[in-house]
């Protein structure tokens, strides 16, 4: 299949491109910067920049994968929050415009979202059947992001809303979470009771590939491992794998002072389960956190 991907140069996008091209799909990566590649089954197409005309360069596209959006890591000023939201909305609207330009519509859209759409809770468990929330910046952003995708779904295109948990890999949150343990200063963050719905980046890429190739999957899909953990368990698992102590607690108020509103990512959470992936037959390689962390650290993919 011909697959167009936004956000293809990012953390997940690079892994996903490898998975899809190895399956024989041709991936067209939409990027602000034009570039050449000798990699088989991969083409870069310039978009969202001066002089770009992706509608003239793209062939018929069978599947769109929309991952584009500014990273949520970093202190959230009002300007940063505006950019986080607008980058996602504008990219999705441009995808819609490009789809409308095609003579033949694609079969599928994979629209990125996040488990933050459920809000936060210590007690509740969230599946794709659960109600969504609009209680904070993350849930509000995910809600509006999916709403933009619904305009494309209304064109009769099978749409999967990939609600991502915290991805573990060589980039993203994990290197930052491991860093204190390198300096023998690891410990429980906040109360330690907050949930972390994690997923190994390779399982995340494989789950998206699975959704692309299985026409029976549509609507929201939690892209998380089947065994979420609380932050205390997560920290103790890092300590075991790294052979480092777990002893120095990090109070919630300290994180709020240091990180501002972004501390919400760390001190709040939700227990999200991948019900749709499991019932449809997807098989996880990394369902156990200790195995996932051991593999990442052993392969030196993570500092």
UniProtKB/Swiss-Prot annotation:
Highest taxon, organism lineage: Bacteria
Signal peptide: none
Gene3D superfamilies (alphabetical): NAD(P)-binding Rossmann-like Domain
A Pfam family assignment: DUF1731
SUPFAM superfamilies found in the cross-reference section: NAD(P)-binding Rossmann-fold domains
NCBIfam families recorded: yfcH
PANTHER family xrefs: EPIMERASE FAMILY PROTEIN SDR39U1, SUGAR NUCLEOTIDE EPIMERASE RELATED
Stated family: Belongs to the NAD(P)-dependent epimerase/dehydratase family. SDR39U1 subfamily.
Protein name, per record: Epimerase family protein YfhF
Gene that encodes it: yfhF
């Amino acid at each position: 299949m011909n697959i167009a991907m936004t956000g293809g140069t990012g953390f997940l996008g690079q892994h996903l491109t490898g998975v899809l091209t190895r399956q024989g799909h041709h991936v067209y990566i939409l990027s602000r910067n034009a570039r050449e590649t000798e990699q088989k089954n991969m083409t870069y197409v310039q978009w969202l920049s001066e002089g770009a005309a992706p509608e003239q360069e793209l062939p018929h596209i069978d599947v769109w994968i929309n991952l584009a959006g500014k990273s949520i890591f970093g202190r959230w000023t009002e300007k940063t929050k505006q950019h986080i939201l607008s980058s996602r909305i504008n990219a999705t609207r441009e995808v819609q415009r490009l789809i409308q330009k095609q003579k033949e519509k694609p079969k599928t859209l994979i629209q990125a979202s996040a488990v933050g759409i459920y809000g936060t809770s210590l007690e509740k468990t969230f599946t794709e059947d659960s109600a969504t929330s609009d209680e904070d910046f993350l849930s509000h952003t995910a809600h509006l992001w999916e709403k933009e995708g619904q305009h494309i779904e209304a064109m009769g295109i099978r749409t999967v809303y990939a609600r991502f948990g915290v991805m573990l890999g060589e980039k993203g949150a994990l290197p930052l979470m491991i860093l204190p343990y390198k300096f023998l200063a690891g410990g429980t963050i906040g109360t330690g009771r907050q949930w972390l719905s994690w997923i190994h980046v390779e399982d995340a890429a494989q789950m998206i590939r699975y959704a692309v190739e299985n026409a029976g999957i549509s609507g929201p899909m939690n892209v998380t491992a089947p065994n979420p953990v609380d932050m205390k368990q997560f920290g103790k698992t890092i300590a075991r794998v790294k052979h480092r102590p777990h002893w120095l607690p990090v109070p919630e108020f300290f994180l709020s002072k240091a990180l501002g509103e972004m501390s919400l990512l760390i001190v709040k959470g939700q227990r999200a389960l991948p019900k749709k992936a499991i019932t449809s037959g997807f098989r996880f390689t990394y369902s156990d956190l200790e195995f996932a962390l051991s593999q990442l650290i052993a392969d030196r993919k993570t500092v």
